[in-house]
């Protein structure tokens, strides 16, 4: 019955709030179509004019787009710019006393940072990096930090002096941190002693110590530690230095480095299907332009708005919509330390009420969890300040969408269901809150200037209602520029599978369906990446970790639907010598494998289900038939062609286990 209700609700069309639409930047579909037409008529002129109007340049660019070495595209060639200057300095004349950042700590502490204060702190931090740690333009700096204001200072300080920052999510294990440090060949690592989570200290420095032990990261010269929770920690003499003790001795004046448009701004590591994380490389100018434009178009950001994106800065959403996008627009951005559930599940709604949040951006996983923990909890708070709601990271189901729309938005806020990726830098497909009629769980239309299409493997367009591969058929300014140190992997990952008019196009790895009106609905991953609570986890990485258990011979991991997390991890495990285990042993083995995953990858990687099988279904070339295993895990009929299997009896044995468990 619930499924029928969801399907019926998903067909409904919700028009933008009329009062909101009247004052929106893009007020109706005619204006949207005019922008799309303008971009289609003269693609380079469209992007060039936006770059001239929206960004502050030290030296103008002389060419909008250089495609000579495609797919290594260059945007705004020979222009000189600085991201930190665009996010801070240019606002000082009119907004120096405006609040740039509102910070609320887990333990109730509170901090307000004006643009003038932000300018001072970023400059002092930049001088500290230059003068005391010899960080220069092009050096890589790893930031392993929690959600505190100093994390933003570090990002902007790196941007100011031309260093390339790479943020590693603070929930990642020492091993995952070590891999990223070594791949980036980082010179400096910045962390905090710890943070607070669920009302208790959560330590980070010990993870850094473990990552660096035994000279495991030879490129690292020094470590900079921010004192946050003041718990006693160990220091390595000559390597570890305390930020809080040094930064105030630095000058608050630091001239921004003149950066080329195409110089790397940051690396952000994301899961790859081979198991080795990919260092996604983003540029200065193109990335910042799209961060600002999507804030203006998708969130209709206004000068007096308080904008809150709940993402961690360790993910691309935190980069673009906690830091760079809001600050490029001169807006006020909120930063929250800790979890949604401490001291109770009303924390987020209290924050929206207290800080008069106008635009609120979060994940479907968070929405589902808050819905499950207190369907009517939001009714205790005044959420009338909200004007736009947004979702990110994964498709949102109709039930969660409906609750978000009705209970959080009071049936008056547009929901911008955004589709994009680490590699795209910013939104690609999204409703516009003042213009686009919306449907539950539908990303709707590509943004102006973006050529997103759903294609078959042969490059032809799918028919309405047919599932295909979501591709982007023209370059755009904020696109990934390379995989750090691995050009071949960049081409193989994104530009090697589907051609349109004889040229390879960007393959997103997501499946999608387009309807007769051009609206696009995202289905989910088509490759070996599982989206758990908005976090992309490579199945190869999970399999590699599980296989380290002494009892495991081999395994295969697939994603299955999860009502809270979006997707969960289901493992098919072959044990040593055909060993079998009873229920108690099975649960203990699951616990041990999850411990390994926590150590190797982080707590976000956790097996939800395990099936112990005698073997895995493989083709004669040795490839595991994952789609077949996914069908079994989801308890769907097997429709795959089994003729290529090396041993069809393996499938029969697995199916007999399924029947026994039922």
UniProtKB/Swiss-Prot annotation:
It catalyses: acetate + ATP + CoA = acetyl-CoA + AMP + diphosphate. ATP binds at residues 393-395, 417-422, 510, 525, 536. Transmembrane segments: none annotated. GO terms for cellular component: cytosol. The keyword Ligase applies. Acetylated. Deacetylation by the SIR2-homolog deacetylase activates the enzyme. CoA binds at residues 197-200, 317, 533. GO terms for biological process: acetyl-CoA biosynthetic process from acetate. PROSITE patterns: AMP_BINDING (PS00455). Its cofactor is Mg(2+). It holds the Pfam family AMP-binding. One of its GO terms (molecular function) is ATP binding. InterPro entries: Ac_CoA_lig (IPR011904), ACAS_N (IPR032387), AMP-bd_C (IPR025110), AMP-bd_C_sf (IPR045851), AMP-binding_CS (IPR020845), AMP-dep_synth/lig_dom (IPR000873), ANL_N_sf (IPR042099). Keywords: Acetylation, ATP-binding, Ligase, Magnesium, Metal-binding, Nucleotide-binding. PANTHER family: ACETYL-COENZYME A SYNTHETASE (PTHR24095), ACETYL-COENZYME A SYNTHETASE 1 (PTHR24095:SF14). Catalyzes the conversion of acetate into acetyl-CoA (AcCoA), an essential intermediate at the junction of anabolic and catabolic pathways. AcsA undergoes a two-step reaction. In the first half reaction, AcsA combines acetate with ATP to form acetyl-adenylate (AcAMP) intermediate. In the second half reaction, it can then transfer the acetyl group from AcAMP to the sulfhydryl group of CoA, forming the product AcCoA. This is Acetyl-coenzyme A synthetase. The lineage of its organism: Bacteria, Pseudomonadati, Campylobacterota, Epsilonproteobacteria, Campylobacterales.
